[in-house]
Structure formats: structure tokens, C-alpha cells
């Protein structure tokens, strides 16, 4: 089994919503958690990311499945950073991961209208 982390470095806060829409995340949320101004909250499409990341913050969404060119079951999206740099991390498990599958996932993101380049995407995986 492989643990896979797809890390996307973002410098524009508007890209967060674009990535969530691209992956169809809002319809697949099992649970989520964001903490802002000493308040626990669930994900909402109305989150003001500029306000949320005015101080270093982290939130996550646990998804039943996510679409990254193909469906991936049981994924976690971690959104962490501050107003200058955000890490949008997608974690999931797979029995195997070929270079072709990695490239398909990266190309799905790169071919969208989102302002992300190949150098902004890092794929990390470990076998266990």
C-alpha cells in the first residue's frame, strides 16, 4: 500500500476555490474542520480565504472521494499557510501508483484553467 501526498504550492488565494471545484470536493465531504478566531467551523463555500489566512492557519476536508481526472476514494485535503503562501495538500492511499497515473493527475490539474505550473506540484509517496 502506498501513502500519496500531492502538494500544490499556491500564491493566489482564489485558486483554493478553483481547486475545490475542479475536484468536486464540496459534494463529497465526509467531515471537515477549520479553526478561525478561536471558533471551530466546518467547511463552507462562503469562507473568506483572505480573512482566514490573514494569520497562519490550517484546515482540512475529509472526502469520500475526489476527482483528479479519475476518482480517488477516501482522500484528505489539507489547506495550510498564510496570506503569502498556501499549501494545498491532497493525501490518499493506493495499492500502486505508476508514473503514468501520476502524470495523468498532474496533467488534469495543469490543463484546467487554474493558474498552476508544473513546478508548483510535488508528488510524494511512501510504501508501507
Language-model segments: which ranges?
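Small/polar-rich, solvent-exposed N-terminal microdomains that initiate assembly or binding
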Residues: 23-61
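Short, extreme N-terminal segment that most often corresponds to the first beta-strand
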Residues: 1-35, 125-127
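Charged interaction segments
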Residues: 50-128
Amino acid at each position: 500500500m502506498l501513502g500519496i501526498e500531492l502538494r500544490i504550492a499556491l500564491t493566489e488565494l482564489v485558486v483554493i476555490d478553483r481547486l475545490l471545484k475542479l475536484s468536486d470536493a464540496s459534494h463529497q465531504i465526509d467531515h471537515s474542520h477549520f479553526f478561525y478566531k478561536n471558533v471551530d467551523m466546518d467547511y463552507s463555500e462562503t469562507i473568506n480565504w483572505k480573512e482566514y489566512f490573514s494569520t497562519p492557519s490550517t484546515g482540512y476536508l475529509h472526502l469520500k472521494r475526489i476527482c483528479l481526472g479519475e476518482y480517488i476514494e477516501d482522500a484528505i485535503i489539507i489547506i495550510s499557510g498564510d496570506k503569502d503562501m498556501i499549501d494545498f495538500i491532497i493525501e490518499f492511499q493506493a495499492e500502486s501508483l505508476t508514473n503514468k497515473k501520476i502524470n495523468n493527475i498532474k496533467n488534469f490539474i495543469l490543463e484546467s484553467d487554474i493558474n498552476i505550473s508544473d513546478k508548483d506540484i510535488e508528488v510524494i509517496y511512501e510504501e508501507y
